[in-house]
């Protein structure tokens, strides 16, 4: 993540974000783009399983398309709504776990159940999405979906959407950084069962994380 450059393109920085996820946590999973989705994490290495995590990346300088703590309704969120609805209703994917918006520094992590509750469970919204997806509305472009369908709906529910937020630039202590990495572990993002004490990090995993982020254990 030290390779993130604010003045570089979204594509440039996205590659570093996906590489970080592969190297740090997901060597046993496929982490790649998927169609128009910036980043997708699959349960399997060969991608034979459905997508379980969807990631939307923006450049740090692209503030207009990235959320803030005061307002989730931006293009990145509108894109996540579209990708979620496609996975749920076009691809019949019922195994989604989390959706993420990040610029490399800031991370908004949202449980897929929040999207299920606020979007997929709304029959009127689902019908509007399906009509648009089947070219039965006056507008058919993805831009129109963002502005005419997703944006008004997000405005209705944004105050009720629960999310985790971290700005890694504010993480000064090694212990705080390790809490961030724990959020990105498969145990959390893929909701995998943990049999060990959740308050303890596996020693090998802990040491590997320190190596990846260029730290040494301080006692």
Question: How does the language model describe each region?
Answer:
Residues 6-14, 69-79:
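Phosphate/oxyanion-binding active-site loops and adjacent basic polyanion-contact surfaces
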């Amino acid at each position: 993540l030290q390779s993130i450059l604010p003045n570089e393109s979204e594509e440039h920085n996205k590659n570093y974000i996906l590489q970080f996820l592969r190297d740090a946590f997901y060597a046993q999973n496929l982490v790649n783009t998927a169609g128009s989705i910036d980043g997708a994490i699959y349960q399997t290495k060969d991608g034979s399983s459905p997508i379980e995590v969807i990631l939307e990346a923006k450049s740090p300088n692209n503030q207009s398309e990235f959320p803030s703590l005061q307002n989730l309704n931006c293009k990145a969120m509108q894109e996540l709504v579209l990708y979620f609805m496609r996975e749920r209703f076009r691809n019949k994917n019922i195994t989604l776990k989390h959706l993420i918006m990040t610029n490399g520094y800031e991370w908004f992590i949202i449980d897929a159940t929040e999207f299920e509750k606020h979007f997929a469970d709304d029959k009127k919204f689902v019908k509007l999405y399906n009509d648009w997806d089947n070219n039965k509305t006056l507008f058919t472009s993805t831009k129109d979906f963002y502005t005419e369908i997703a944006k008004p709906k997000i405005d209705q529910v944004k105050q009720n959407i629960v999310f985790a937020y971290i700005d890694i630039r504010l993480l000064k202590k090694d212990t705080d950084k390790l809490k961030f990495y724990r959020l990105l572990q498969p145990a959390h993002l893929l909701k995998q069962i943990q049999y060990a004490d959740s308050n303890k990090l596996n020693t090998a995993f802990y040491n590997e994380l320190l190596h990846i982020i260029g730290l040494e254990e301080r006692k």
